Amino acid sequence: MEINMKKTLLLLSLFLFSLPSFAGQFVQIKNVEVHYSAFNSTFLTPKVARAYQLKRSGYTALINISVLDISQAGKPAISAQVSGTAKNLLGQTKTLTFREIKEKNAIYYIAELPITNEETFRFDIDVSSGKKGAGKLKFNQKFYVEE
């Protein structure tokens, strides 16, 4: 029980740490809200990175997606299929591999992306939660290497 509480707190800190700069970044697709953030993995504590087997490096960004069902009270998190690509300004495309992380009532889809300093990416993310909603999420993000 104590281990689950620690994991919950670690995951909560992962999600909350991404919020200050990116609060309110979401799109509505039919009956779901798709929340997204992208940030340097050094924002994670070493403990959180280890707990979820995430690479913590100044040259690695994390893309965090969560899907909420707005047709239900309290907007609960729901499972979805998430895939996508990131294209830099040189036209180099990288396929994003999202990993689902479930913890209590929260569901996160996390992908790692190698970055260089001041690199800008155009993200093209496909999200499908069945009949609740399916569609594309597009956004740009500039990253800075943290050493």
What residues fall within each predicted segment?
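Beta-strand-rich domain onsets/edges
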Residues: 25-62, 144
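Short, solvent-exposed, Trp/other aromatic-anchored flexible loops in extracytoplasmic proteins
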Residues: 99-122
